[in-house]
A protein has these predicted regions:
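A cross-kingdom feature that marks ATP-driven nucleic-acid transaction machinery
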Residues: 27-197
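Conserved helicase/translocase motor-coupling segment
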Residues: 1-37, 43-44
């Protein structure tokens, strides 16, 4: 899984392809370990924000160098949303943060009143000393529906750590009515202190 996110259909294709081959999960794990040891990729663990514990589910992998990734796949896929998420991950690591992927378990009633359990994802849980930030990477926020989708996991977190959306949209840095900071990717990359504003 050497990308920040894979589309659902791509995941199914990969799973089916691997099942048809004679490659074992242990072999895949070894290759991923080799890639990590050679500093091609880095893994981020999943962290249950409410339960305050790491989850033994698949990790997410990020490339150290997106140029190498793009060259290796012959520049066939350029998914800007995934690339931006990878850039944010790399910048956070460069600034010294430990970075995990957040999971927020929720129980919600559907239209019929039946309770369903879901896991909402927070792209990054960043820790440095006593500072913690929850960060969502949103390539664009074209409408209120997309903004609501990005804010939803934050609203289910019951602590006072800072919650931030980083977007490619050229918006001024601002807080919304829930205290969630929105900052554009350019300000984030150029101003190491922008998360503290």
């Amino acid at each position: 899984m050497p990308h920040s996110r894979l589309e659902q259909s791509s995941q199914l294709f990969v799973v089916r392809t691997v099942k048809k081959s004679k490659i074992t999960s242990n072999t895949i794990k070894k290759y991923l370990d080799y890639f990590e040891d050679s500093f091609l990729i880095e893994s981020a663990q999943r962290y249950d924000i409410k339960g305050k514990a790491y989850i033994e589910t698949p990790k997410k992998y990020y490339f150290f160098d997106l140029g190498l990734r793009n060259a290796r796949i012959n520049f066939r896929q350029f998914e800007q949303t995934h690339s931006m998420e990878n850039v944010i991950y790399n910048e956070l690591r460069m600034r010294g943060y430990s970075v995990d992927v957040g999971v927020v378990p929720v129980a919600e009633k559907d239209r019929n009143g039946k309770v369903t359990r879901k896991q909402l994802e927070v792209d990054f849980v960043c820790n440095l000393g006593s500072s913690r930030y929850y960060i969502q990477s949103a390539y664009t926020l074209p409408d209120e529906a997309k903004r609501t989708q990005e804010v939803r996991p934050f609203r289910k977190i019951d602590d006072s750590f800072r919650k931030i959306i980083i977007t490619r949209d050229m918006v001024p840095t601002h807080y919304d009515e829930y205290g969630i900071l929105t900052v554009n990717i350019y300000d984030f990359l150029l101003d190491p202190k922008c998360l503290e504003k």
